[in-house]
Curated annotation (Swiss-Prot):
Superkingdom: Bacteria
One Gene Ontology molecular-function label: structural constituent of ribosome
Annotated gene: rpmH
HAMAP family: Ribosomal_bL34
Family indicated by similarity: Belongs to the bacterial ribosomal protein bL34 family.
Protein name in the entry: Large ribosomal subunit protein bL34
Entry keyword Ribonucleoprotein: yes
Pfam families per the UniProt record, alphabetical: Ribosomal_L34
Source organism: Chelativorans sp. (strain BNC1)
Length: 44
């Protein structure tokens, strides 16, 4: 059986990266929430 997690740096960046987050209103909310919380890493 094939495992569900097949790591790919490109796919990770495209789906969860900073620019992907900033592209939608909800994503900008995620970044804002993580900034307010003081997260060291905002996105993948």
């Amino acid at each position: 059986m094939k495992r569900t997690y097949q790591p790919s740096k490109l796919v990770r960046k495209r789906r969860h990266g900073f620019r992907a987050r900033m592209a939608t209103k909800g994503g900008r909310g995620v970044i804002a929430a993580r900034r307010n919380r003081g997260r060291k890493r905002l996105s993948a």
